[in-house]
Swiss-Prot record:
Belongs to the universal ribosomal protein uL11 family. One or more lysine residues are methylated. One of its GO terms (biological process) is translation. One of its GO terms (cellular component) is cytosolic large ribosomal subunit. PROSITE patterns: RIBOSOMAL_L11. Forms part of the ribosomal stalk which helps the ribosome interact with GTP-bound translation factors. It comes from Brucella canis (strain ATCC 23365 / NCTC 10854 / RM-666). Part of the ribosomal stalk of the 50S ribosomal subunit. Interacts with L10 and the large rRNA to form the base of the stalk. L10 forms an elongated spine to which L12 dimers bind in a sequential fashion forming a multimeric L10(L12)X complex. CDD domains: Ribosomal_L11. It comes from the Bacteria. This is Large ribosomal subunit protein uL11. SUPFAM superfamilies: Ribosomal L11/L12e N-terminal domain, Ribosomal protein L11, C-terminal domain. Pfam families: Ribosomal_L11, Ribosomal_L11_N. The keyword Translocase does not apply.
Length: 142
């Protein structure tokens, strides 16, 4: 018989750095999820990823207190800031430029994010990422 789903929880956890301290511990604990079990499973699953990169994770927890989780790729903004060597985007996008990024880098980001984006092809994914770049105050060149 199938397990009864009690709910879902979305978190953004640094790769390889899940620990029971806030905000992860309280978010899991109040839903009755075994915190240490999640931390061990997540850290093992995110070993191959770049240490410290923010990983969106969707946790489905069941009434019997068990859980499953699905890891996504890091957010587009993380990739854009990394590609443009920025700490943060522009405070006034459209007026002040935070930096530039080439179309080649946009294509690389689109290919990395393709499985998580709702895009038919790489060109559509590139347009989405260029929109995110403009929202951050980045200029797409090339």
């Amino acid at each position: 018989m199938a397990k009864k789903v009690a709910g879902q929880l979305k978190l953004q956890v640094p790769a390889g750095a899940a620990n029971p301290s806030p905000p992860i511990g309280p978010a899991l604990g109040q839903r009755g999820i075994n915190i240490m079990e999640f931390c061990k499973a997540f850290n093992a699953a995110s070993q191959e990823m770049e240490k410290g990169s923010p990983i969106p994770v969707l946790i489905t927890y069941y009434q019997d207190k068990s859980f499953t989780f699905v890891m996504k790729t890091p957010p587009v903004t993380y990739f854009l800031k990394k590609a443009a060597n920025l700490k943060s985007g522009s405070k006034t996008p459209g007026k002040a430029s935070a930096g530039t990024i080439t179309r080649d880098k946009v294509r690389a980001i689109a290919e990395a994010k393709m499985k998580d984006l709702n895009a038919a092809d790489v060109e559509a994914a590139m347009r989405m990422i260029e929109g995110s770049a403009r929202s951050m105050g980045l200029e797409v060149v090339g």
